[in-house]
Amino acid sequence: MHNLVINDLPEEGLPTALFEPSELIDFKIAWDWQRKWQEKLLAEPSNKQAVWMLEHFDCYTLGRGASEDNLLFDVEKPPIDFYRIDRGGDVTHHLPGQLVVYLVLDLRRYKTDLDWYLRQLENVLLDVLDGLGLNGYRINGMTGVWCNGKKVASIGISCRRWITQHGIALNVDCDLLGFNQIVPCGLKDYQTGRLNSWLPKLQMKEVRFLMKKSLNKRFGLLWI
């Protein structure tokens, strides 16, 4: 059992706009938010960075260069909304009960290295699981985070002149049935998991708190 105390977040760091809509958000809307903020940062590098923490309506997204062989449904008649997008990675599923974190960051303020950025996002997820008393881990040569033999978090990003988009998706208390319609991330030999399989009383607000805390730690973000 986890025993998390939600207290105050750190009060130092780079001022960063944090958006946490309480309602479910259509994927296209969230994607548009990111693109507009990215344009602002490209136009004026001194602008604030931005992070969104939200949950989506059911949808599938297919990253650039991904294989349609990993879609186990008729592409012409998808069972739910389906989007081809500009992030890296293969196909994934977004749905209620999954915490999605989108980051529009200027990597010139950190390190202009996409592999470093991906590993930092994994570190954020590992921090969150550790804060819940779970043993998360990476698998060499793959991107994402696993727990007890199951992949619980996916990462997919895009970057334009070192300004990022997209981010991470962490399965908290979502229905996993929709993952049966795809080969998640193109990985045939791995099962998909969710955190409340091991922590039945886990609440999304706890995960959000730990996510904000770790993003402050790993990227020095001060929430405004």
Swiss-Prot record:
It holds the Pfam family LplA-B_cat. It is an enzyme of class 2 (transferase). Its EC number is 2.3.1.181. Residues 45-223 form the BPL/LPL catalytic domain. GO terms for molecular function: lipoyl(octanoyl) transferase activity. It is found in: Cytoplasm. Substrate binds at residues 87-94, 154-156, 167-169. Keywords: Acyltransferase, Cytoplasm, Transferase. The keyword Ligase does not apply. It catalyses: octanoyl-[ACP] + L-lysyl-[protein] = N(6)-octanoyl-L-lysyl-[protein] + holo-[ACP] + H(+). Catalyzes the transfer of endogenously produced octanoic acid from octanoyl-acyl-carrier-protein onto the lipoyl domains of lipoate-dependent enzymes. Lipoyl-ACP can also act as a substrate although octanoyl-ACP is likely to be the physiological substrate. Belongs to the LipB family. In the reaction, the free carboxyl group of octanoic acid is attached via an amide linkage to the epsilon-amino group of a specific lysine residue of lipoyl domains of lipoate-dependent enzymes. This is Octanoyltransferase. It comes from Prochlorococcus marinus (strain SARG / CCMP1375 / SS120).
